Amino acid sequence: MATPHINAELGDFAETVLMPGDPLRAKFIAENFLEDVKQVCDVRSMLGFTGTYKGKRVSVMGHGMGIPSCSIYVHELIKDFGVKNIIRVGSCGAVHDDVKLMDIIIGMGASTDSKVNRIRFNDHDFAAIADFHLLETSVQQARLQNVNVRVGNIFSADLFYSPEEGLFDKMEKLGMLGIDMEAAGIYGVAAELGAKALTILTVSDHIKRGEKLSSEDRQKSFGEMMNVALETAVNI
């Protein structure tokens, strides 16, 4: 049954949904990586698709930008459509000197300046972490593909244009590998509703060094990340 934000029917989504931020990226993934594709939703142009990868059902849907947006879609997918596994696929900025452009980062945990998880946990700190089985499977699949991945803590920011000076230096000191805007929220929703979640990111920018990927390199690293994510989706 359709929800306020997802006009699909029960059974339209696979148990595992890959979620990029951009709905057009979801369409690209469906058209270029999946077979037997069916579009299942389009409310507010947030496109969702279900198809098969190596004979197994997989869905892909955009989640928008930021924790409030992604939390709505993840909540409804899990609670109303029976989705069991959420795998966020996207890009991130890096601040750590040891992280390079095109690195693939798997978010074992996600710190944040958002208060959403404190709201969930009576104003206490909540350790927003990936599901271990998804994490372990993704690392195994990356190794089978000879794809190097970095596993560690990331930071989910509420502000893209942050005025907070000195924060990047502190992130580097604490060993945070990348900065996105959604992972901590997705992990929180999944934990609250009893589902599993993982975040896989490609480094598209190095914030402290002022480096950015070219379009060609961005596409190459995206392809490697998608292969890891899809192999994870069909091997859990």
UniProtKB/Swiss-Prot annotation:
<feature type="binding site" description="in other chain">
    <location>
        <begin position="180"/>
        <end position="182"/>
    </location>
    <ligand>
        <name>a purine D-ribonucleoside</name>
    </ligand>
</feature>
<protein>
    <recommendedName>
        <fullName>Purine nucleoside phosphorylase DeoD-type 2</fullName>
        <ecNumber>2.4.2.1</ecNumber>
    </recommendedName>
</protein>
<comment type="similarity">
    <text>Belongs to the PNP/UDP phosphorylase family.</text>
</comment>
<comment type="function">
    <text>Catalyzes the reversible phosphorolytic breakdown of the N-glycosidic bond in the beta-(deoxy)ribonucleoside molecules, with the formation of the corresponding free purine bases and pentose-1-phosphate.</text>
</comment>
<keyword id="KW-0808">Transferase</keyword>
<feature type="binding site">
    <location>
        <position position="44"/>
    </location>
    <ligand>
        <name>phosphate</name>
    </ligand>
</feature>
<feature type="site" description="Important for catalytic activity">
    <location>
        <position position="218"/>
    </location>
</feature>
<feature type="binding site" description="in other chain">
    <location>
        <position position="25"/>
    </location>
    <ligand>
        <name>phosphate</name>
    </ligand>
</feature>
<dbReference type="InterPro" id="IPR035994">
    <property type="entry name" value="Nucleoside_phosphorylase_sf"/>
</dbReference>
<dbReference type="GO" id="GO:0006152">
    <property type="term" value="P:purine nucleoside catabolic process"/>
</dbReference>
<feature type="binding site" description="in other chain">
    <location>
        <begin position="204"/>
        <end position="205"/>
    </location>
    <ligand>
        <name>a purine D-ribonucleoside</name>
    </ligand>
</feature>
<feature type="binding site" description="in other chain">
    <location>
        <position position="21"/>
    </location>
    <ligand>
        <name>phosphate</name>
    </ligand>
</feature>
<comment type="subunit">
    <text>Homohexamer; trimer of homodimers.</text>
</comment>
<dbReference type="InterPro" id="IPR000845">
    <property type="entry name" value="Nucleoside_phosphorylase_d"/>
</dbReference>
<dbReference type="GO" id="GO:0004731">
    <property type="term" value="F:purine-nucleoside phosphorylase activity"/>
</dbReference>
<feature type="active site" description="Proton donor">
    <location>
        <position position="205"/>
    </location>
</feature>
<dbReference type="InterPro" id="IPR004402">
    <property type="entry name" value="DeoD-type"/>
</dbReference>
<dbReference type="GO" id="GO:0005829">
    <property type="term" value="C:cytosol"/>
</dbReference>
<feature type="binding site">
    <location>
        <position position="5"/>
    </location>
    <ligand>
        <name>a purine D-ribonucleoside</name>
    </ligand>
</feature>
<dbReference type="Pfam" id="PF01048">
    <property type="entry name" value="PNP_UDP_1"/>
</dbReference>
<keyword id="KW-0328">Glycosyltransferase</keyword>
<dbReference type="InterPro" id="IPR018016">
    <property type="entry name" value="Nucleoside_phosphorylase_CS"/>
</dbReference>
<feature type="binding site" description="in other chain">
    <location>
        <begin position="88"/>
        <end position="91"/>
    </location>
    <ligand>
        <name>phosphate</name>
    </ligand>
</feature>
